[in-house]
């Protein structure tokens, strides 16, 4: 039974009203300062009075600027909370990315060129969402790898070789990533992108079925016009750490596993190497937000929504009731219930309502060890097709292949959007317990397997 607690939306409404009052008061005071300055005449104000008026106006602008997203974030939280209570989904209606124009590309190219000169390391022109690229030949890619089969500590995996020579579009840039291996949080990545629909099939990693989105270094890609012509860039000096030319495709397979003492065989993949392939990044550093907005990863609308919710939560935590959005309740039980639906790819299912899922969660927001993340709430009440069953996966911290006793389900087109995780671009597949789903209709015979974006 879910423990009873005060309704969070009441505290949220108080914060919205208070922030709106502060913002309105700031607007009225700012209007008064401006009118007084205009009526008095600029020449009649002493330097001290002018400085005080200017400082006051600036402070009022800051107050209004902080109050506005707080109110907007609170209203979004209240609306979504009502939808969750009614079991109605609110998934993203369109892609969050946009295509940067020539001006953005030129400015970013200049900054990148300056960085290359200062660091002494050649860097290609950046890739952006919607760019059409061709994956370099395997021979070209192998020349960029060090003896560990990595570039900037990011492995090129054998599963990626199948796409060499193919044309694909860039989904988004990966300038930051969440480190779930060491728990160090948000980390900075460079010169890395996702390509549309290219996910790891786990063929060379023990049949891992988590369908992680493959990470591609820009050095492994080249722009193409779409008519078979690619735009090769000057190679420049060899990349630091480039391996011996004798490095072969078979070496990639050899580097997939390693043996470490009592732990036995451990798999090496891009997700196990996230910490090594990235650098620490402060959550309070605003530059990663600017990169998201200016370089095409997040359109203005989703950006405003995400930042407003974050601002609302910060105000709520410091000045309000402390109850943040989104909220989940749990049963508090030590063990969680289980249900077997034997779902198969192609089955149509409905994600259960929030209050139904809450009854299946232990104190750690888990069911049989699988965490129900707040990113998943937006899909509650929606109908989706099953894309895959997951009963084998690589545990990222240990690198060991695990057979899952309670299979998980991946739904077609249902991925983490990163709105509550500072717009993290990983586009992870979301794993679902069968007890969180209900079958709507079985899969038609001979229906082709669906793929995630």
Residue ranges and their predicted role:
Residues 2-23:
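Juxtamembrane interface helix immediately N-terminal to a transmembrane segment
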Residues 16, 20-24, 58, 62, ...:
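Alpha-helical transmembrane spans of integral membrane proteins, capturing the lipid-embedded, hydrophobic core
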Residues 28-41:
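Membrane-helix interface motif
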Residues 43-59:
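Membrane-interface segments at the starts/ends of alpha-helical transmembrane spans
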Residues 64-82:
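Membrane-helix interfacial anchor on the cytosolic side
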Residues 86-101, 120-124, 128-129, 139-220, ...:
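Basic/aromatic-rich interaction segments and small domains that mediate binding to polyanionic partners
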Residues 131-135, 346-351:
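Generic structural signal for buried aliphatic residues
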Residues 318, 322:
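Carbohydrate-associated surface elements
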């Amino acid at each position: 039974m879910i423990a009873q607690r005060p309704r969070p939306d009441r505290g949220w409404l108080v914060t919205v009203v208070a922030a709106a009052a502060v913002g309105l008061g700031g607007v009225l005071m700012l209007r008064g300062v401006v009118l007084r300055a205009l009526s008095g005449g600029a020449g009649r104000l002493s330097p001290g009075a002018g400085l005080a008026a200017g400082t006051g106006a600036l402070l009022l602008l800051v107050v209004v600027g902080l109050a506005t997203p707080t109110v907007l974030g609170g209203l979004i939280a209240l609306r979504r909370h009502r939808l969750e209570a009614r079991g109605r989904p609110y998934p993203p209606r369109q892609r969050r990315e946009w295509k940067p124009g020539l001006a953005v590309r030129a400015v970013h190219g200049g900054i990148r060129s300056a960085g290359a000169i200062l660091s002494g390391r050649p860097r290609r022109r950046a890739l952006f969402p919607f760019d059409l690229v061709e994956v370099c030949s395997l021979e070209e890619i192998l020349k960029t790898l060090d003896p560990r089969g990595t570039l900037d500590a990011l492995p090129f995996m054998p599963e990626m070789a199948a796409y060499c020579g193919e044309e694909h579009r860039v989904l988004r840039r990966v300038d930051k990533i969440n480190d779930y291996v060491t728990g160090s949080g948000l980390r900075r990545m460079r010169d890395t992108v996702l390509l549309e629909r290219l996910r790891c099939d786990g063929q060379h990693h023990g049949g891992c079925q988590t369908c992680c989105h493959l990470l591609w270094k820009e050095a492994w890609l080249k722009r193409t016009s779409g008519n078979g012509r690619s735009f090769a860039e000057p190679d420049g000096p060899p990349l630091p750490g480039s391996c011996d030319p004798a490095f072969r495709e078979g070496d990639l397979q050899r580097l997939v596993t390693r043996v470490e003492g009592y732990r036995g065989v451990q798999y090496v993949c891009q997700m196990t190497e996230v910490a090594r392939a990235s650098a620490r990044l402060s959550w309070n550093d605003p530059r990663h937000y600017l990169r998201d907005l200016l370089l095409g990863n997040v359109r203005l609308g989703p950006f405003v929504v995400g930042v407003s919710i974050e601002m609302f939560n910060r105000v709520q935590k410091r000045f309000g009731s402390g109850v943040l959005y989104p909220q989940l309740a749990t049963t508090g039980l030590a063990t969680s219930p289980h249900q077997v639906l034997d779902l198969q790819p192609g089955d149509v299912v409905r994600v259960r309502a929030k209050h139904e899922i809450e009854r299946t969660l232990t104190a750690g927001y888990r069911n049989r060890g699988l965490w129900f993340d707040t990113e998943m709430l937006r899909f509650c009440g929606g109908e989706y097709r099953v894309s895959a069953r997951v009963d084998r996966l690589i545990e990222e911290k240990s690198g060991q292949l695990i057979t899952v006793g309670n299979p998980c389900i991946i739904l077609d087109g249902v991925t983490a959007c990163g709105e509550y995780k500072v717009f993290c671009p990983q586009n992870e597949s979301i794993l679902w317990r069968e007890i969180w789903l209900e079958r709507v209709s079985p899969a038609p015979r001979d229906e082709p397997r669906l793929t995630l974006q």
